[in-house]
From Swiss-Prot:
It comes from Bacteroides fragilis (strain ATCC 25285 / DSM 2151 / CCUG 4856 / JCM 11019 / LMG 10263 / NCTC 9343 / Onslow / VPI 2553 / EN-2). The gene is lepA. It comes from the Bacteria. PANTHER family: TRANSLATION FACTOR GUF1 HOMOLOG, CHLOROPLASTIC, TRANSLATION FACTOR GUF1-RELATED. It is found in: Cell inner membrane. GTP binds at D14, H15, G16, K17, S18, T19, N128, K129, C130, D131. Pfam families: EFG_C, GTP_EFTU, GTP_EFTU_D2, LepA_C. This is Elongation factor 4. Residues 2-181 form the tr-type G domain. Belongs to the TRAFAC class translation factor GTPase superfamily. Classic translation factor GTPase family. LepA subfamily.
């Protein structure tokens, strides 16, 4: 056990953790030199250059004549996946903190770092990409020293591209990170930190043993669900899975026991023996709560069941996705899905498209609201269509977040303007180093879900980074904004918005829809309404044929007769005609600027 080291890598998006991980794997001869990131195995992860799922891999390394086992648990860096990070961190004793030499400390670096410090991990700071021309290792060292309070000589300079500093990192992992603690003779206690779905073997759970021993064929049970299984196969994770007869305290491995549904494997759950269970679960397990909700509808109504099957399969290795059936007048049957955030939502959409070939329409994303009626009863609403009658409502509460934005001093003005427009209130600002500031805001989550992140990046030329934590619910003056096409409400376009922004938003939505809905044979009125009050209107004129073309010279009354006839026809058409709203329109409404 004292020859095992479990560690993870903490970094902001794009600071090069997956590349550096590749170098560590090559150096310890775990893999041959290959193309691209080994640990990001989804196509989507490689394309976007982000890590979505946590991964684990075991390396063997001989140091000063002794053989050590190093378990690297890779973590995602994006704010949407912070629960994945927290579970990976809980399975480790140490962490490599990677900071980009040209970008310095970013918001997510800090939030994941605090998580690691809460779990008492040994932190090894590394400055990556030191071979770049734009690298500023001295300034970044100052920031790290100020952040961690460590000594300068504890910071390792490295480069994932050239492989510089890799040997020092491995030496530091062995010397500075403590070996796992635990008692082999105690009852089995193991933490699940990830699960993947394999269509032949069912669900494979990855775990780390904190106490006890597990052998193949043991009867085990999962603590929080209380279900029992037989451990058909256990083993360790190298580039592929290597079966073993037994795993002992401190080991990181996998278990296959023919589990078919993801709901039974909850990440953060504890595995123990049926015959000799441990007293209590490992602390820190929490159900992941989705933050952003959107309707997902199949384009063809008969694909509803296929969509359900696809979502269930996605849920197998993405436990944070939730969904329940709902129906909409405009779009038919579909699902109301809960996501961790906007990136997560985009990824789920892309995976539906790529892995299951499903074409879907997604509605405007929104958050969950607490609605109190006059009697003081609370209902939770994820969907503007579920809003009760406005006369019954006493007040509405919406979720708030505490946001931290790190930026250079040049962009403070525009960023503050953006946050004010999103109803944010500045709590405080702190200077991290000479020209970098951290701004703390309280903001409604609903204002952020649509385009906040994109706009923050474009205002600050990509220099601002953003991170947030939920901060409870607060009362707010919200109204339901409906969009009517020819007097019929399109429920998929309804949104809940703050009263102060409603007029502006209604006007912009009408203008946007006017551009996107194709002209029909009859005229279309696009209206935005709050309750019964119309607040904005645009009209799409009808396409019409020149019916008087065949009258040469001729009498005006003859022409008038033909025009009247055409007008009647158009009127009749308008009564029975329905308006096709293209998918583009649903998406464009999300990104109003």
């Amino acid at each position: 056990m004292d020859k095992i080291r479990n560690f993870c890598i903490i970094a902001h998006i794009d600071h090069g953790k997956s590349t550096l991980a590749d170098r560590l794997l090559e150096f310890t001869n775990t893999i041959q030199v290959t193309e691209g990131q080994m640990l990001d195995d989804m196509d989507l992860e490689k394309e976007r250059g982000i890590t979505i799922k946590s991964h684990a891999i075991q390396m063997e390394y001989t140091y000063k004549g002794e053989k050590y086992i190093l378990n690297l648990i890779d973590t995602p860096g994006h704010v949407d996946f912070s629960y994945e990070v927290s579970r990976s961190i809980a399975a480790c004793e140490g962490a490599l903190l990677i900071v980009d030499a040209s970008q310095g400390v970013q918001a997510q670096t800090i939030s994941n770092l605090y998580m690691a410090i809460e779990h008492d991990l040994e932190i090894i700071p590394i400055i990556n990409k030191c071979d770049m021309a734009s690298a500023m290792p001295e300034e970044v060292e100052d920031e790290i020293v100020e952040l961690l309070g460590c000594k300068r000589d504890e910071i390792i300079r490295a480069s994932g591209k050239t492989g510089m500093g890799v040997e020092e990192i491995l030496a530091a992992v062995i010397e500075r990170i403590p070996h796992p603690q635990g008692d082999e003779s105690a009852p089995l206690q193991a933490l699940i930190f990830d699960s993947v779905f394999n269509s032949f073997r069912g669900i494979i759970a990855y775990f780390k043993i904190t106490n006890g021993v597990i052998r193949a064929g043991d009867k085990v049970k999962f603590f929080n669900t209380g279900k029992e299984y037989v451990a058909d196969e256990i083993g360790v994770l190298k580039m592929e899975m290597v079966p073993r007869k037994e795993l002992r305290t401190g080991d990181v491995g996998y278990i296959i026991s023919g589990i078919k549904t993801s709901k039974e494997v909850k990440v953060g759950d504890t595995i123990t023996h049926v015959a000799r269970p441990c007293d209590k679960a490992i602390a820190g397990f929490e159900e992941v709560k989705p933050m952003v909700f959107a309707g997902v509808y199949p384009i063809e109504a008969e694909e509803f069941e296929d969509l359900r099957a696809s979502l269930e399969k996605l849920q197998l290795n993405d436990a944070s996705l939730t969904f329940q059936p709902e129906s909409s007048l405009a779009l038919g049957f579909g699902f109301r899905c809960g996501f961790l955030g906007l990136l997560h939502m985009e990824i789920v959409q892309e995976r539906l498209d790529r892995e299951f070939d499903m074409n879907v329409i997604t509605t405007v994303p929104n958050v969950s609201y607490h609605i109190y009626d006059k009697q003081g009863n609370m209902t939770e609403v994820h969907n503007p269509g579920g809003m009760p009658d406005p006369t019954m409502i006493d007040h509405i509460e919406e979720p708030y977040i505490k946001a931290s934005i790190i930026t250079t001093t040049d962009y403070i003005g525009p960023i503050m303007t953006l946050c004010l427009g999103k109803r944010g209130e500045l709590l405080k600002q702190e200077y991290i180093s000479g020209n970098r500031v951290e701004l703390f805001y309280n903001m409604p989550l609903g204002e952020i879900v649509i385009d906040f992140y994109d706009r923050l990046k474009s205002i600050s030329k990509g220099y601002a980074s953003f991170d947030y934590h939920p901060d409870g619910f607060r009362p707010s003056k919200l109204v339901k904004l409906d969009i009517l096409l020819n007097g019929e409400s399109v429920d998929a376009l309804s949104t809940l918005t703050h009263f102060d922004n409603a007029y502006d938003m209604g006007r912009r939505m009408c203008e946007k829809l006017k551009e996107l809905i194709p002209r029909q044979q009859f005229e279309i009125a696009i209206q935005a309404a709050i309750g019964a009050k119309i607040i904005a209107r645009e009209t799409i004129k009808a396409v019409r044929k020149d019916v008087t073309a065949k009258c040469y010279g001729g009498d005006i009354s003859r022409k008038r007769k033909l025009l009247e006839k055409q007008k009647k026809g158009k009127k009749r058409m308008k009564q029975i005609g329905n308006v096709e709203v293209p998918q583009k329109a649903f998406l464009a409404v999300l990104k109003l600027d």
